[in-house]
């Protein structure tokens, strides 16, 4: 099993030194991710592509899914490599492979060639295409918009028949740009803005300001972990949780109602700047879009930025909400975001749309900044990979089992894509599929006389959700221990 990985076009047009550096980083990223799932995977860098090989055909679907989510990959080809002796031999090998596929269909042949040969790429296309047309009675050549395009790459004495072409997410490899700190709330905007910086080549760390208690923090951890695991698992990142309840309380007590929204955002960027400075991070990322809510006017955004000691990046600044939600669906964070309450907007009933600097500074003069300092000093710093370990400690009261009892039902909380790809086999026991992001709204509608055993592939989400359900009064939950690490 072999894949030919093609780099993002913007990488290919850079200087040779930069292109080599980017390709080297991408090769390392691919290796870091794929070898976690298949230790025998080989990743080799060439001048204009990266070669991925694996002997384990059973891992094909998983390797394809992983490659499709690695930043820096424009597309990749699934190929079958064979040695050849001459052009007629290439035709014979191609005929044996595609004859069945071309029955009753129109086709064309496209050849890319490297090395010295007695034929050109066009001559190869004509010879192979003509031969296929003669030997397969029910097929017909069509050069424009054919049913099937037979793609062949020829390099020296080997031919690669392209079995499939898979799109990547493009962008730059993680690590080619500097680190950023994303202010993640669990909503649509912050998840998408985090993804956009990952796709642009930055390692994204996460800073969460907790305004809503343990359940809110669990939900945000789920989103951060989901984004990291799907798109940036090649790198270690930090998850920082700052308890902002005291800061919000001080604002509610000391700040004029209309100025609360801007003041709260200024406190957040102050705190985030301190965290960024601690880890030598140059920029913080927010999900704000111009005019989307009252605090997101140019005047207010400028005043918010004045409180920051780090560069503030807003990748969604010109995006419509509809576009943002569509992107959230693409990256798989939309359902998590739907379950997240928006806390920032509820503390001010009549927010100002054009804050005045002097008035903001006067209101902040009433604020006790020791509360902000204390919140930052008491922040919790976590390697995002340790979310599973931390959750295991928190869910000590949730029983983990590997053998199912009579009254127990497996609750498969993986995404629909994962369950379709790899269904859970339970034997005689019932299996209910309910993605983790729907548990908060749908678990209560299940038959509560049953005991539900939560299952996910890695064991992380099942433990997070078990904690959430326990905190909400459901005692009939357990965790399936098969994949707990």
Swiss-Prot record:
Pathway the protein acts in: Cofactor biosynthesis; thiamine diphosphate biosynthesis
Q: Where does ATP bind?
A: 183-184, 265, 287, 296
GO molecular function ontology, one term from the record: CCA tRNA nucleotidyltransferase activity
Q: Where are the transmembrane segments?
A: none
Enzymatic reactions: [ThiI sulfur-carrier protein]-S-sulfanyl-L-cysteine + a uridine in tRNA + 2 reduced [2Fe-2S]-[ferredoxin] + ATP + H(+) = [ThiI sulfur-carrier protein]-L-cysteine + a 4-thiouridine in tRNA + 2 oxidized [2Fe-2S]-[ferredoxin] + AMP + diphosphate; [ThiS sulfur-carrier protein]-C-terminal Gly-Gly-AMP + S-sulfanyl-L-cysteinyl-[cysteine desulfurase] + AH2 = [ThiS sulfur-carrier protein]-C-terminal-Gly-aminoethanethioate + L-cysteinyl-[cysteine desulfurase] + A + AMP + 2 H(+)
Q: Which GO terms describe its cellular component?
A: cytosol
Location of this chain's protein in the cell: Cytoplasm
List, alphabetically, the SMART domains matched: THUMP
| Single GO biological process annotation from the record | thiamine diphosphate biosynthetic process
Q: Report whether Transferase shows up as a keyword of the record.
A: yes
Report the residue ranges that make up the THUMP domain in this protein: 61-165
Specify the superkingdom: Bacteria
Q: Which cysteines are joined by disulfide bonds?
A: 344-456
Rhodanese domain sequence ranges: 404-483
Q: Which UniProt keywords apply?
A: ATP-binding, Cytoplasm, Disulfide bond, Nucleotide-binding, Redox-active center, RNA-binding, Thiamine biosynthesis, Transferase, tRNA-binding
Please state what class of enzyme this protein is.
transferase
Q: What is its EC number?
A: 2.8.1.4
InterPro entries xref list: Rhodanese-like_dom, Rhodanese-like_dom_sf, Rossmann-like_a/b/a_fold, ThiI_AANH, ThiI_fer, ThiI_N, THII_Thiazole_biosynth_dom, THUMP_dom
- The active site of this protein is located at 456 (cysteine persulfide intermediate)
Q: Which HAMAP family match?
A: ThiI
Function of the protein: Catalyzes the ATP-dependent transfer of a sulfur to tRNA to produce 4-thiouridine in position 8 of tRNAs, which functions as a near-UV photosensor. Also catalyzes the transfer of sulfur to the sulfur carrier protein ThiS, forming ThiS-thiocarboxylate. This is a step in the synthesis of thiazole, in the thiamine biosynthesis pathway. The sulfur is donated as persulfide by IscS.
Protein family (similarity comment): Belongs to the ThiI family.
Entries under NCBIfam families matching the protein? ThiI_C_thiazole (TIGR04271), tRNA uracil 4-sulfurtransferase ThiI (TIGR00342)
UniProt cross-references to PANTHER family, sorted A to Z: TRNA SULFURTRANSFERASE (PTHR43209:SF1)
**Protein name (record):** tRNA sulfurtransferase
What is the organism field in this record?
Haemophilus influenzae (strain PittGG)
Tell me what gene encodes this. thiI
